[in-house]
């Protein structure tokens, strides 16, 4: 009971402080966000008092639960549910802003205009959908590969709920116009501080689990996860160094200025793509692809070479975002050179993942989850070829500031991050909820095709739009003046913007189908359907044996 009172007291104190901060706030946005914190603290107080499990709390939140033989999968289950929820929210906002670009009348001032919804979309899919995927999958993978329960179970739960609070504060801030205007780092100083606390707790849980492992070897997926956690911490702290105007206000000013500010921002921005959207998703690939294919990783040595090559090269490539700017030319060239070198280790990882399917290629036809993983690896290979190509100065002179970059980013995000995340969710749900199988594998197949066709429409439309923009912007007449005004280029892109909205809608529809599939699986239902076609397979020839048509068999008789 004493522990319950202590926790209730902490929640009550947090609520009082939040209410006082809201009362004395220097601006309305800060007051609104402090009231959100107060509501969260009130909910925590209510849970502590009304639903307290005195026995569990008395045992100590940092001690092992009674049965150490089972893995601690509660935070993983919550993370999977959060992943599914935020995927739909983030993609729904993405479809809305795609429609706003095609039909500007859909902008609603001030809260639902493109300027406020665009960072909500990017943070929603990167940090809410992607971040929850990574936290949940890392908790699952580190326990299985270390044969140990999560260290600090209470802290693991704090990480989950603390991260959801970060998402809510960041998202509500964007709608209120509270932003640092730094790509992928829009939240203001107090939200950044909260995320730092949550991230340190995440690091403690992950490293603590590694330290208590029963398996002597640390599997390579955990190397990728740990580098993700450490590097994102470094990037987040340095890039978000700022001086608040007031400790009771939302506004702050960066510690950097001028070209140093730009370089610091894109050192962070590029490496957010590298160490948030690439490295930890490769950790997922190195665990889930072999598990689903029931094959060992093709080359463990190649995975180690892949890891160290990426770690050394990726951190230097940020200046390629600042080609043809005030950044010194030597720094631009350095970023270009390291970006080109990244092509080989990136493809090494793709090849390692694809070659893991040696002897199991028949499953690509019969297992839509494997098919999603293969498509994810294909898009990873394509995006990591296109990125170095776009960093070459002569190519970048055409693509810079155009929608080609948008197409490149979304081919990677939708194809690589989205597909591998969906596959991981489909892998995890039956195992976490102890179900025989998913509600419907055929729905997974439908999801795969809707997502794939949606990506093709989206990326192709943006590639065409980007090249159109680049060529129209640089077209000069005989008199030496530009032929096209900016408005002319925008009008020319209208058909491509409609195609982008259509592709995004298809991709969103697939995610909604996933939500239904996951929910019905959790409820324990199974759709009455024939299993996916299993062709008779000739292993030596690595191809299916084509059945003889019935009329030929009858003629032979």
Model regions: which residues?
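Hydrophobic cores of alpha-helical transmembrane segments in multi-pass integral membrane proteins
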Residues: 3-57, 77-178, 190-210, 222-247, ...
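Membrane-proximal first intracellular loop
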Residues: 67-74, 116, 185, 214-220, ...
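Acidic, Ser/Thr-rich low-complexity segments on the non-lumenal side of membrane proteins
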Residues: 547-557
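Conserved, charged catalytic cores of large soluble enzymes
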Residues: 62-63, 235-256, 261
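Membrane-interfacial, low-structure loops and terminal tails that flank and connect transmembrane helices
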Residues: 54-76, 360-363, 435-438, 528-541, ...
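Active-site-proximal inter-transmembrane loops
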Residues: 255-264, 399, 404-406
């Amino acid at each position: 009971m004493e522990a319950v009172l202590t926790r209730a007291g902490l929640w009550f104190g947090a609520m009082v402080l939040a209410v006082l901060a809201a009362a004395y706030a220097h601006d309305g946005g800060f007051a609104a966000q402090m009231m959100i914190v107060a509501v969260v603290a009130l909910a925590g107080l209510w849970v502590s008092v009304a639903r307290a499990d005195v026995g569990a709390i008395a045992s100590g939140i940092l001690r092992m639960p009674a049965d150490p033989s089972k893995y601690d999968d509660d935070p993983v289950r919550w993370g999977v549910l959060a992943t599914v929820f935020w995927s739909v929210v983030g993609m729904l906002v993405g479809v809305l802003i795609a429609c706003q670009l095609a039909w500007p009348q859909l902008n609603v001032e001030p809260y639902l205009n493109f300027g406020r919804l665009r960072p909500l979309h990017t943070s929603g899919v990167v940090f809410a959908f992607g971040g929850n995927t990574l936290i949940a999958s890392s908790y699952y993978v580190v326990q299985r590969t270390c044969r140990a329960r999560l260290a600090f179970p209470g802290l693991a739960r704090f990480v989950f709920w603390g991260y959801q609070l970060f998402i809510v504060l960041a998202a509500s801030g964007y709608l209120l116009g509270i932003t640092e205007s730094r790509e992928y780092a829009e939240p203001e100083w107090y939200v950044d501080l909260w995320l730092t606390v949550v991230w340190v707790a995440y690091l403690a849980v992950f490293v603590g689990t590694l330290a208590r492992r029963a398996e002597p070897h640390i599997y390579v997926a955990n190397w990728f996860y740990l580098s993700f956690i450490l590097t994102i911490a470094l990037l987040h702290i340095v890039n978000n160094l700022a001086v608040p105007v007031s400790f009771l206000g939302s506004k702050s000013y960066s510690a950097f200025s001028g070209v140093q500010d730009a370089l610091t921002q894109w050192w962070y921005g590029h490496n957010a793509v590298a160490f948030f959207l690439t490295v930890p998703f490769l950790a997922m690939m190195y665990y889930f692809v072999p598990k689903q294919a029931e094959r060992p990783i093709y080359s463990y040595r190649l995975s180690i070479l892949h890891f160290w090559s990426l770690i050394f090269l990726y951190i230097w490539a940020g200046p390629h975002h600042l080609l043809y700017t005030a950044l010194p030319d030597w720094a631009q060239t350095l970023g270009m050179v390291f970006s080109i070198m990244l092509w080989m280790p990136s493809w090494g990882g793709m090849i390692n993942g694809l070659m893991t399917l040696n002897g199991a290629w028949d499953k690509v036809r019969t297992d839509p989850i494997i098919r999603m993983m293969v498509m994810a690896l294909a898009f990873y290979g394509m995006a990591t070829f296109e990125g170095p190509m776009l960093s070459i100065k002569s190519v970048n002179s055409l693509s810079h500031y155009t929608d080609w970059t948008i197409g490149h980013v979304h081919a990677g995000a939708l194809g690589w991050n989205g597909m591998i995340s969906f596959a991981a969710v489909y892998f995890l749900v039956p195992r976490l909820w102890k179900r025989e199988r998913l509600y419907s594998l055929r729905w997974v197949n439908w999801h795969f095709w809707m997502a794939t066709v949606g990506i093709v429409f989206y990326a192709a439309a943006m590639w065409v739009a980007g090249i159109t923009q680049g060529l129209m912007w640089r077209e000069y007449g005989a008199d030496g003046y530009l032929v096209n005004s900016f408005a002319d280029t925008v009008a020319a892109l209208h058909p491509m913007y409609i195609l982008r909205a259509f592709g995004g809608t298809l991709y969103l529809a697939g995610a909604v189908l996933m939500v239904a599939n996951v929910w019905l699986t959790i409820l324990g239902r199974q759709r009455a359907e024939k299993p996916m076609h299993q062709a008779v397979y000739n292993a030596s020839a690595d191809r299916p044996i084509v059945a003889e048509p019935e009329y030929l068999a009858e003629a032979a008789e």
